[in-house]
Amino acid sequence: MADEFSAGPDHRVGDHVAFTADVPHVYTRAQWNARPPRRPAKVLGRPPDHIVVHHTATANSSDRSLGHAFALSRSIQNFHMNGNGWDDTGQQLTISRGGIVMEGRNRSLKAVRAGDLAVGAQVLHHNGHTIGIENEGTYTNKRVPGRLWDSLVEVCVWLCQAYNLDPSQAIVGHRDYNSTACPGDVLYAQLPKLRRSVAARLNGSPSPGGVTGGQQMPAFPTFGDFG
């Protein structure tokens, strides 16, 4: 399709495109049928300095389909615009539990291509220097699905390359900036492994293994906890 954002080799898993190259296949807003934003996102002519990992704090769905992923993006946009009164989806990128990667905030993909930042609404007081990845699910005491984890690694590799970021410093969790349980204790505990996996890919080494379980904790945020 003409509006797909992809490069390098890819292969199909089920009804969506999976990726194994450093530039992932990202489904555009047009493909998941996004609403028009209230106004275009502000684009800064400079890169972000941090990649912020979130979780949606929604149900840990077993549906890995493309249709489910697109519905997820629409539900997030509706919640952010109707519930929070924001101009558009807060985060720049969204990954479903099936590992499907989608553009979130308008102008995000074009900005990444240019090495710029489309300012989102995903980290209170820190939106002007961060780019956010929303991961479907609640990871307070549940494992991260392998497909989601693999896509998260690939997306972080892509962003670190595009913005010349050091994963050991750049990849953080939402709770590192704001008072929140996001991205859940299990996913947050995996961030050191994520940094190592991304660094290994950037250095040309095989990515170390998949995700493992983590600690258990109670409270979790809602979509409105992005600030």
Residue ranges and their predicted role:
Residues 1-59, 71, 96-115, 119-227:
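Basic/polar, cationic surfaces and motifs that engage anionic cell-wall
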Residues 64:
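Extended ligand-binding clefts on enzyme/binding-domain cores
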Residues 67-83, 88:
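Glycan-recognition patch characteristic of GH18 chitinases/ENGases
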